[in-house]
C-alpha cells in the first residue's frame, strides 16, 4: 500500500515522501496515529495544500521536544524494585516504569517515547533512549535499586555485586578473627594443662 508520510517516521522516510508499506502497518499504525495518508490523487492534492501548515506544526513540536531534551538529557531516575541477593529483579523494569519515574520527577514523558531494546531485569545503572520527537532523541539513566540507600550507593559508583563482595569479605574476616581468637584460647588452655606424671 502506498502512503504519504505526514511526519518523519524512523526507517521509513521524511514528511511528504510517498512510500510503500505493508497494508497492516498502514491500517494499524500509520493511519490511526495520523502519521500518513493513503496515497490517492485527492490526498496528494490535500497534502500539498496543507504542507506549509504541517511543516509549521512539525517545527513547533520539534522545538518543544528540543527544549525538553536540554533539561532531560543525562538525568538519573531511581526505580525501586524487589530483587534477589544476586541482583536479579523479581519481574522487570518496562518503558512504563521509566516513563512514570521521569513523570514523577516533573518531566512529561510517555511510555511510547521510551526505547528499551529489552526489559531491564537486574539491579544497577542502565542507560535508556527517549525519543521525544522523530528527530530528537536523548539518553536518561535509570538507577534500579532495592532501596533509596542502595540507589545512593549505586549513584556514587558502587555496584550491588561490589557491595555484596565487600560485605562477604568483612563477614569472612570477622569469622577468621573469631577462629583465631578461639584457636589462641585453645593453645593457652593446652599450655596451662598440668603435665601428666609419666613415671607412674
Curated annotation (Swiss-Prot):
Keywords, sorted A to Z: Ribonucleoprotein, Ribosomal protein, RNA-binding, rRNA-binding
Any Gene Ontology biological process: translation
One Pfam family cited in the UniProt record for this chain: Ribosomal_L9_C
PROSITE patterns per record: RIBOSOMAL_L9 (PS00651)
Cellular component terms (Gene Ontology): ribonucleoprotein complex; ribosome
GO molecular function (one): rRNA binding
Keyword rRNA-binding: yes
Gene3D superfamilies found in the cross-reference section: Ribosomal protein L9, C-terminal domain, Ribosomal protein L9, N-terminal domain
Superkingdom in the source lineage: Bacteria
Family that this chain belongs to: Belongs to the bacterial ribosomal protein bL9 family.
Name this polypeptide is given: Large ribosomal subunit protein bL9
Gene expressing this chain: rplI
Amino acid at each position: 500500500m502506498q502512503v504519504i508520510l505526514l511526519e518523519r517516521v524512523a526507517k521509513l522516510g521524511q514528511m511528504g515522501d510517498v512510500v510503500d508499506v505493508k497494508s497492516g502497518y498502514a491500517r494499524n499504525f500509520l493511519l490511526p496515529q495520523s502519521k500518513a495518508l493513503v496515497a490517492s490523487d485527492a490526498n496528494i492534492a490535500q497534502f500539498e495544500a496543507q504542507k506549509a501548515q504541517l511543516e509549521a506544526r512539525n517545527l513547533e513540536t520539534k522545538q518543544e521536544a528540543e527544549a525538553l531534551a536540554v533539561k532531560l538529557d543525562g538525568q538519573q531516575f531511581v526505580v525501586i524494585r524487589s530483587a534477589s541477593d544476586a541482583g536479579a529483579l523479581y519481574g522487570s523494569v518496562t518503558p512504563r516504569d521509566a516513563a512514570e519515574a521521569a513523570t514523577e520527577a516533573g518531566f512529561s514523558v510517555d511510555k511510547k517515547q521510551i526505547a528499551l531494546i529489552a526489559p531491564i531485569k537486574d539491579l544497577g545503572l542502565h542507560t535508556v533512549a527517549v525519543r521525544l520527537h522523530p528527530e530528537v532523541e536523548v539518553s536518561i539513566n535509570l538507577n534500579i535499586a532495592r532501596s533509596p540507600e542502595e540507589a545512593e550507593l549505586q549513584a556514587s559508583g558502587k555496584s550491588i555485586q561490589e557491595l555484596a563482595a565487600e560485605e562477604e569479605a568483612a563477614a569472612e574476616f570477622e569469622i577468621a578473627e573469631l577462629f583465631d581468637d578461639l584457636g589462641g584460647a585453645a593453645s593457652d588452655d593446652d599450655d596451662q594443662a598440668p603435665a601428666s606424671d609419666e613415671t607412674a
